[in-house]
């Protein structure tokens, strides 16, 4: 039934540990995700790997197949395209759209941080957090931790700490640079965590 059927959609550009491996090689990962839906939630899921990296083509394709699904799970789509793809599909479809690499990861990190802070007797506002990676997961982790009231977050990408004015950042990174790194630290990860 439509209400119990989810499309697991990927273009294979950001497969965990493998990177941009393309749609054919990504299929076993999507099949595995579909099995997890069935095993743990009794939700039927259908893996779909698209042979395009074009944002508009992905959005249009998902919109065209959406009427037969109860939800869309976006999977392993590289940043920064994944942000626009998810945002637009949420705006344009009347079914749930979820990008697992962003939100699933952020939820797990937030849960771990809540418990870690309990163990050390700190509040969210007192925490100083460094996030290594400013792609889809890192940006989403940062957004969720900001909603939880974390006091200071520094996002670090391969080119360094996100700080306003850096020309190399994409739009999502620029947004986070304005909301984080209150001391305007610069440099690579080893310099930030010292």
Give the positions of each predicted feature.
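Glycine-rich phosphate/diphosphate-binding loop of Rossmann-like nucleotide-binding domains
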Residues: 16, 21-41, 93, 99, ...
């Amino acid at each position: 039934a439509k209400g119990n059927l989810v499309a697991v959609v990927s273009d294979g550009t950001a497969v965990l540990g493998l990177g941009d491996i393309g749609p054919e090689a990504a299929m076993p990962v999507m099949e595995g995700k579909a099995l997890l839906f069935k095993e743990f939630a009794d939700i039927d899921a259908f893996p779909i790997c698209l042979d395009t990296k074009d944002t508009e083509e992905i959005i249009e394709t998902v919109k065209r197949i959406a009427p037969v699904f109860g939800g869309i799970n976006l999977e392993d789509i590289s940043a920064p395209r994944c942000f626009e793809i998810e945002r637009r599909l949420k705006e344009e479809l009347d079914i749930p759209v979820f990008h697992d690499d962003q939100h699933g990861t952020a939820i797990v990190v937030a849960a771990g941080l809540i418990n870690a802070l309990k163990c050390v007797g700190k509040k969210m506002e007192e925490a100083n957090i460094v996030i290594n990676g400013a792609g889809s997961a890192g940006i989403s982790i940062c957004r969720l931790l900001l909603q939880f009231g974390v006091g200071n977050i520094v996002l670090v990408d391969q080119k360094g700490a996100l700080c306003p004015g850096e020309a190399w950042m994409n739009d999502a990174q620029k947004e986070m640079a304005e909301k984080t790194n209150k001391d305007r630290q610069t440099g690579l990860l080893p310099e930030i965590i010292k």
